[in-house]
Regions:
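Generic enzyme active-site microenvironment
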Residues: 50, 281, 317
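Short, glycine-/Ser/Thr-/acidic-enriched flexible segments
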Residues: 1-2, 9-11, 27-28, 55, ...
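Glycine-rich phosphate-binding loop of nucleotide-binding enzymes
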Residues: 1-72
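P-loop NTPase motor domains
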Residues: 3, 10, 53-71, 79-312, ...
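Conserved ATP-driven motor cores of ASCE-family P-loop NTPases powering translocation/secretion/packaging/pilus
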Residues: 74-77, 81-111, 292-398
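Short, surface-exposed polybasic-aromatic patches that bind anionic ligands, especially phosphate groups
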Residues: 397-408
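Short, solvent-exposed amphipathic alpha-helical segments in soluble enzyme
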Residues: 242-245, 364-365, 402
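Structural motif
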Residues: 40, 272, 336-339
């Protein structure tokens, strides 16, 4: 028996990307493994971003000097109107920002809005950002007119948008032209639908949604954890928007930091060993990556495919293999989750039920020997079958007394 040294961001001819998948039944040590990974990357000086669905990561995050924010409004707000750095091109960032807000709006309208209403919504957004001074009056966005990375208080809030909608509707003047007048009436009705939606959001969910982003210099925070325990209990139309916005903020961080590292490395200003990486952790991912939150699954798929370019990786964790691998009986949404998990280079498989063995054999033919497969149901706490590239290793993870105290709540 020897020691096991693991770095998520080691690249070889077989290990080409930095995504990982952790399976482990309750009590198998799945969350402990994730916390060990967080500790390691923090010691390396890398960035860590966590989605915490159970509220158990706070002691570790704070011990490592990180920031912990509950997204239910207790600790502050993530402003969905803040434009994230989701691409190296500012114009593309705007397009993706409108796409994000449109997706969230559609979710809040529970898919009851037609394409014409969505078109009106995107037009109102552009006019609003121009009136607010974020977008130039001609609507043209260039690298010389940055719209990303501004101080959080520079961006509008949900109540600002509601004020703009009220004013826009009150000041509307119908056209004397009959044809255009009819179009104007349709526009007015659609704009009023948008206004009504945001009025409800500000009145009933303002403490969660309406305000500037609470954490300043968020991209400079090494370890950041969003607690979504209470958020997951909200109605899906509200919950999905908050989760989607949180994912976009994490993606913003990866692109922003990764682009800087890429430029420094390609200009030979830093060596490969000096690159700062970003790791996103999603524990109990079955709470978010499911048919109820399809837009979140799509966004995570984009991130999983693109993060390698930005020296970043995602670690998904869930309990049973059968939670996500449904085989031929999977729905379209379930297949999307399966496709997402297929993007993982590393797999850590902890204790599973015996019924999972046929699923493993079918999903990963030839990947595991018969002996390895039949070891999985009898793995003890802290033991995992680790696959990295073309290697399988059975590894036992241990914790110190200090870690035992910090990891309390999920082991």
């Amino acid at each position: 028996m020897g020691s096991f040294n693991f770095n998520l961001f080691t690249k070889t001819k077989k290990r080409l990307s930095y995504n990982a998948l952790v399976y482990g039944a309750m009590g198998s040590g799945k969350s402990t493994l994730l916390k060990k990974l967080i500790e390691v990357q923090a010691l390396f000086g890398d960035y860590v971003r966590i989605l915490d669905p159970s509220g158990e990561y706070q002691p570790l995050v704070e011990a490592l000097g990180g920031k912990y924010l509950s997204l239910d409004g207790r600790d502050g707000i993530l402003n969905e109107f803040e434009i994230q750095k989701t691409d190296e091109n500012e114009g593309t960032c705007w397009v993706q920002h409108v796409s994000k807000l449109t997706a969230i709006y559609r979710l809040r309208r529970q898919n009851q809005c037609g394409q014409n209403e969505l078109n009106t919504y995107s037009k109102l957004l552009l006019d609003f950002y121009i009136s607010f001074g974020i977008i130039p009056k001609d609507g043209k966005i260039t690298q010389q007119t940055p719209i990303c990375g501004l101080p959080s208080e520079y961006y509008p809030t949900m109540s600002d948008f509601l004020t703009y909608l009220n004013k826009r509707i009150q000041e509307y003047e119908p056209s004397v032209d009959a044809e255009h007048g009819e179009l104007g009436k349709k526009f007015l009705l659609q704009a009023d639908e948008v206004r009504s939606t945001y009025e409800n959001l500000v009145r009933n969910y303002g403490s969660l949604l309406d305000g500037h982003t609470s954490i300043q210099n968020i991209s400079q925070t090494q370890i950041l954890c969003f607690n979504v325990y209470t958020v997951l209990k909200l109605e899906p139309a509200i919950c999905s928007g908050i989760l989607y916005n949180a994912l976009m903020m994490y993606w913003d961080h990866c692109v922003r930091v990764g682009s800087r590292m890429k430029a420094l490395y390609e200009n030979r200003e830093i060596a490969e060993r000096d690159i700062i990486h970003s790791m996103v952790i999603m524990d109990e991912s079955h709470h978010i990556l499911n048919a109820q939150f399809v837009d979140c699954v799509r966004q995570m798929t984009v991130m999983a495919r693109e993060m390698r370019k930005y020296f970043s990786g995602i670690v998904f964790a869930t309990q049973l293999i059968t939670d996500n691998l449904k085989g031929d009986n999977a729905s379209t949404e379930e297949k999307a989750v399966q496709d997402l998990f297929d993007l993982a280079t590393y797999r850590f498989i902890g204790k599973q039920t015996a019924t999972c063995i046929p699923v493993l054999e079918s999903k990963f033919p030839g990947m595991y020997t018969e002996t390895e497969l039949y070891r999985i149901p009898s793995l003890d706490m802290g033991s995992f079958m680790v696959t990295a590239g073309d290697q399988n290793l059975e590894v036992k993870f241990f914790i110190t007394e200090t870690e035992d105290h910090l990891f309390a709540g999920g082991r």
